[in-house]
A protein has these predicted regions:
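Sec-dependent bacterial lipoprotein signal peptides
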Residues: 1-19
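An acidic-aromatic pocket/loop used at catalytic or ligand-binding sites
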Residues: 21-205
Length: 205
């Protein structure tokens, strides 16, 4: 994803004849791209991997949970696109624990409550009450969204359990993946959408 994003923006800059385009790529010890930064006079995109923690998302780490570091995941991702007043920001990090999913769900329901009402979603449908937050966020919001950086997919899969809090524009999500090796796996996502983006409008932002 990072290489494609950088290539696209550089191509746009050259096609438009924009002066002052700057591209910076940091690589890891094995040559993998750890971050890509493309800056232009009218905006840019910054992508970082393996540098974000739960605290950066405004959430605590479940006690004893470990960052997922298998081949299917970066440990975390931080994606920022900004073009004038149009800005999109996604932060994501994945963890696993030997504790049960129910224990993790209970922990994050309490942790997410700092952002207001917490809704429980299964397959984009609400489970129990409330069915939407006081700021208008529902289980339908973001039903087609995926957070993927390279081979690392932070989506929790169709039909899996998610906890959500916030508004349509500013969301905090804890989603649960299928268990692996007897461990509960979950991803935390902080999502900030630009004003006017389809699905992000509403009385509250």
């Amino acid at each position: 994803m990072m290489r494609e994003a950088a290539s696209l923006l550089v191509g746009l800059a050259l096609a438009a004849g924009v002066a002052g385009c700057r591209v910076h790529v940091d690589k890891g010890v094995n040559g993998e791209e750890k971050s890509v930064q493309v800056d232009m006079p009218f905006g840019g995109v910054h992508v970082k991997t393996d540098q974000t923690t739960a605290a950066d998302l405004g959430l605590p780490v479940y006690p004893g949970a470990q960052l997922i570091t298998d081949n299917d995941h970066h440990k975390s991702a931080d994606v920022h696109l900004g073009f004038g007043e149009w800005e999109l920001r996604v932060k994501a990090v994945s963890y696993s624990t030997a504790d049960s999913r129910d224990q993790v769900v209970a922990f994050y329901k309490k942790a997410l409550s700092r952002y207001g009402d917490v809704i429980t979603c299964q397959g984009n449908a609400p489970v129990g009450m409330p069915t939407q937050t006081s700021e208008g966020l529902t289980c339908e919001e973001g039903k087609n969204a995926r957070v993927q950086v390279g081979s690392a997919d932070y989506s929790t899969g169709k039909g899996n359990l998610e906890l959500k809090a916030g508004s349509k524009r500013h969301q905090h999500i804890v989603g649960f993946e299928n268990p692996k090796n007897g461990k509960t796996r979950f991803a935390m996502v902080a999502l900030d959408l630009p004003a006017g983006l389809q699905g992000s409008s509403g009385k509250s932002d």
